[in-house]
Amino acid sequence: MDHTDAIDAFIEAANTTDAERRADLLARALARDVVFWSPLGRGEGRGSVEDFITQVVQGHPAGPCRLVRTTGVDAPGEWARFGWSYVDAAGRTLLSGVDVAHVTPDGDIDEIVVFAGELA
């Protein structure tokens, strides 16, 4: 799996409500011991990413929302970055940002850092 495939599998996992499908996508995209940095803190393991998805991404008070990759994947070597938006059912952007991911030689994301919002 290349960088773009891993990132797109991660985004698809964030958007699916089927727990089994989400777990499969996360297993394809993320190393078992992935380190996940979000605005809410640091988590380790696929379970921490799954918890973030179900509680924060899918549990948003605005109702059903989805994560959309808004840029190409810039991948110099083992690092990748991409832009994203979090949009509601009407297509309005609620939040946007850039994520940076470290990708192993096997194509698994073993670290991901979420940068949400605009820089001052």
Where are the regions that the model predicts?
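Short acidic-aromatic low-complexity motifs
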Residues: 1-29
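A solvent-exposed, acidic/Ser-Thr-rich amphipathic alpha-helical stretch
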Residues: 23-76
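A beta-strand edge to alpha-helix "cap/lid" segment located at domain peripheries
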Residues: 56-120
